[in-house]
Amino acid sequence: MSNAQLETAIEAAWEARDTITPATMGETREAIEDTLAALDGGTLRVAEKQDSGDWHVNQWAKKAVLLGFRLKDMEMQGGSAQGGSWWDKVDSKWATWGDNEWGAAGFRAVPNCVVRKSAYIAPGVVLMPSFVNLGAYVDSGTMVDTWATVGSCAQIGKNVHLSGGVGIGGVLEPMQAGPTIIEDNCFIGARSEVVEGCIVREGSVLGMGVFIGQSTKIVDRETGDVMYGEVPSGSVVVAGSLPSKNGVNLYCAVIVKRVDERTRSKTSINELLRD
């Protein structure tokens, strides 16, 4: 099916989602499985950047990810340490892979990383022991460091560094209108969290322990401007606070400056790790 045909079939299946079971066959199953396969192979994305800089969300692709849970029963998933297993409805991305598939994929997966089927990992990515959820897209040259998590349908750009313990939020629970997006050449500091469909624009740097959701105030220190849900391109952001009332200060994220050469020298990627 073409993408237009898939979209039509997925939208129809969504309206009848309560009737979909592991016994469902025909066009509905084909459309769901083909959409998940396209997401897995990177030929389809849940969100795509337009020439204007805006992100277009393919809501139907996100619906297909959810519908996939209706098509399968729980089953044993192999591959755990010491011959152990998991109990889930979603296969590992590489459950059936051999040398040829790994060679063609072109990314590096360190022991104990987990990627679920329908997530795309581009060539040149390095996955330390980390977790990438279904429907996500991780672009080339990116490092997903130890204990970092990439949530369902999240979009991670090229040459991004997600430091240890970083959390990038998903869209499936609670349901979000759009995915969390980290654009190209961003550095996300250790233990930071970006969630609820927020966007970190190209070339930005988040310091350690920065938390950004849709209700988080993002304050530009130079101008005093307050924004929500989006970090402007080339920003350096740290954790801060603003006075509230009764002598209480509340958390905010503070844009302290724009990225300069000194910042780049501290946050540039190491090509030796990506050979």
Swiss-Prot record:
Q: Which Pfam families match?
A: Hexapep_2, THDPS_N_2
Give the binding site residues for substrate.
R108, D145
Which keywords has UniProt assigned to this entry? Answer: Acyltransferase, Amino-acid biosynthesis, Cytoplasm, Diaminopimelate biosynthesis, Lysine biosynthesis, Repeat, Transferase
Q: Which Enzyme Commission numbers does its entry carry? A: 2.3.1.117
One Gene Ontology cellular component annotation held by this UniProt entry = cytoplasm
A GO BP entry is: lysine biosynthetic process via diaminopimelate
Q: What is its main location?
A: cytoplasm
Q: Name one GO molecular function term.
A: 2,3,4,5-tetrahydropyridine-2,6-dicarboxylate N-succinyltransferase activity
Cellular location of this protein?
A: Cytoplasm
Per the record, what are the reactions this protein catalyses? (S)-2,3,4,5-tetrahydrodipicolinate + succinyl-CoA + H2O = (S)-2-succinylamino-6-oxoheptanedioate + CoA
Q: Which domain of life is it from?
A: Bacteria
Tell me which SUPFAM superfamilies the record gives.
Trimeric LpxA-like enzymes (SSF51161)
Instruction: Report the PROSITE patterns cross-referenced here.
Output: HEXAPEP_TRANSFERASES
Please state what class of enzyme this protein is: transferase
Read off the InterPro entries from this record: DapD_Trfase_Hexpep_rpt_fam (IPR005664), Hexapep (IPR001451), Hexapep_transf_CS (IPR018357), THP_succinylTrfase_dom1 (IPR023180), THP_succinylTrfase_N_sf (IPR037133), Trimer_LpxA-like_sf (IPR011004)
Pathway(s) this gene product operates in, as recorded in its UniProt entry: Amino-acid biosynthesis; L-lysine biosynthesis via DAP pathway; LL-2,6-diaminopimelate from (S)-tetrahydrodipicolinate (succinylase route): step 1/3
NCBIfam families hit by this protein: dapD, PRK11830.1
Assembly? Homotrimer.
Q: What PANTHER family does the database record attribute to this sequence?
A: 2,3,4,5-TETRAHYDROPYRIDINE-2,6-DICARBOXYLATE N-SUCCINYLTRANSFERASE, MOLYBDENUM COFACTOR GUANYLYLTRANSFERASE
Which family does the similarity line name?
Belongs to the transferase hexapeptide repeat family.
The cross-references to HAMAP family, in alphabetical order and at most eight, read:
DapD
Protein name listed in UniProt: 2,3,4,5-tetrahydropyridine-2,6-dicarboxylate N-succinyltransferase
This protein's species is Jannaschia sp. (strain CCS1)
Q: What is the lineage of its organism?
A: Bacteria, Pseudomonadati, Pseudomonadota, Alphaproteobacteria, Rhodobacterales
